Regions:
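Alpha-helical solenoid repeats of the armadillo/HEAT superfamily
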Residues: 2-39, 66-83, 113-129, 141, ...
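Alpha-solenoid helical-repeat scaffolds
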Residues: 39-137
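Short, hydrophobic/charged alpha-helical patches characteristic of ARM/HEAT alpha-solenoid repeats
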Residues: 46-50, 92-98, 135-142, 184-191, ...
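Buried hydrophobic core positions in alpha-solenoid tandem helical repeats
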Residues: 57-61, 102-107, 144-152, 196-200, ...
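Register-specific detector for alpha-helical tandem repeat solenoids, activating on a conserved position
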Residues: 83, 93, 106-107, 123-126, ...
Length: 319
């Protein structure tokens, strides 16, 4: 987020800098005029106060009532403004450490009766916790995992339907919550998260939701040995991954193929290895996969997908 006040300070600082001639690098630093220093400190303090007050005001709006559609609209607007402010990691940390905004946002997943509020809250959570270990930890403390899983399952307070956008944003937030964190990934698995993902992988599932779920599955099995082992214990999930890997949808096929490649890397043992995967493959799977490879060969932009499909064929034949 570009801060107008910060940009003004930068322009003012440049205007106060003597750039007309070269300075001796060994010369002592130029001492800022006391009046200029006082001005700069005053503006910087004002900037911090203004940003902090704005963040706290947004959190108060997020915590406000939503008995009417108008109140719900005000809350969505506050959540969207927080999203605009939290697009940088320092602001994301400050959203909770300074304004204590993460907990009430997480609570909306459970308490709100408006789908647009829940969806926007999930979007904000995903942004705040992504690549942000302190916020990931705070989100776990605020029970983000069970509440996001419940939203993804369609378990909401008003008992009404949960739309595709809500589910997509819940899955995206779950992905951000557990990424790069083995303990979080294990908690996700223990909470039944893999079974929840499997429900969205059928070919008749909404396309955007299926693609997002396959992306999350791909990331999870690439990072987590426990997730790879858990996948190999679920024949239904393996069959769905294989079916998606030869589907017409290029994005879904790419993510599913990458997931299967990761599963093929599980170390083999007396009764381990990828035997469960082989058993779960649809009839004529290798033939279908090779047919997809033939299509990829004609696409100059599909080199990565072609390489993954080729690696999968080699791994299955070697097994």
């Amino acid at each position: 987020m570009d801060n107008p006040m910060l940009n003004s300070i930068l322009r003012w600082s440049i205007s106060q800098t003597d750039t007309g001639s070269e300075r001796d690098p060994n010369a002592p630093p130029v001492v800022m005029d006391p009046e200029k220093r006082e001005f700069l400190e005053r503006v910087m303090n004002q900037m911090v106060e203004d940003e902090g007050k704005s963040m706290k005001d947004l959190v108060e709006a997020i915590k406000g009532p939503e008995q009417s559609l108008e109140q719900a609209s005000v809350k969505v607007d506050a959540l969207e403004q927080a999203i605009d402010r939290c697009d940088k990691i320092d602001y994301a940390v400050g959203f909770h450490s300074f304004a204590n905004g993460l907990f009430p946002t997480i609570e909306l997943l459970e308490t709100s009766e408006h789908g647009n509020v829940r969806a926007t809250a999930a979007e904000l959570i995903a942004l705040v916790v992504k690549d942000n270990p302190p916020c990931q930890a705070w989100a776990f403390e605020g029970q983000a995992l069970p509440r996001l899983l419940a939203l993804h399952r369609g378990e909401v307070r008003d008992g009404g339907p949960v739309g595709e956008t809500e589910k997509i944003r819940a899955v995206a937030a779950l992905s951000a919550l557990i990424q790069h964190t083995p303990e979080a990934q294990l908690a996700f698995l223990q909470a039944g998260g893999l079974d929840d993902l499997q429900r969205d992988l059928a070919l008749d599932a909404p396309r955007r939701l299926r693609a997002r779920t396959l992306f999350v599955t791909r990331s999870l099995v690439a990072e987590s040995p426990e997730a790879r082992r858990a996948c190999l214990e679920r024949a239904g999930l393996l069959t769905l991954l294989a079916t998606n890997s030869v589907a017409d949808d290029a994005e879904c096929a790419e993510h599913a193929t990458a997931s299967l490649c990761a599963l093929c890397e599980v170390p083999a043992g007396p009764k381990a290895g990828i035997a469960p995967l082989i058993a779960a493959l649809p009839p004529d799977y290798l033939k279908l996969l090779r047919a997809r490879m033939a299509k990829l060969e004609a696409d100059p932009d599909a080199a990565e997908s072609l390489s993954a499909a080729s690696s999968l064929v080699d791994a299955l034949i070697a097994a």
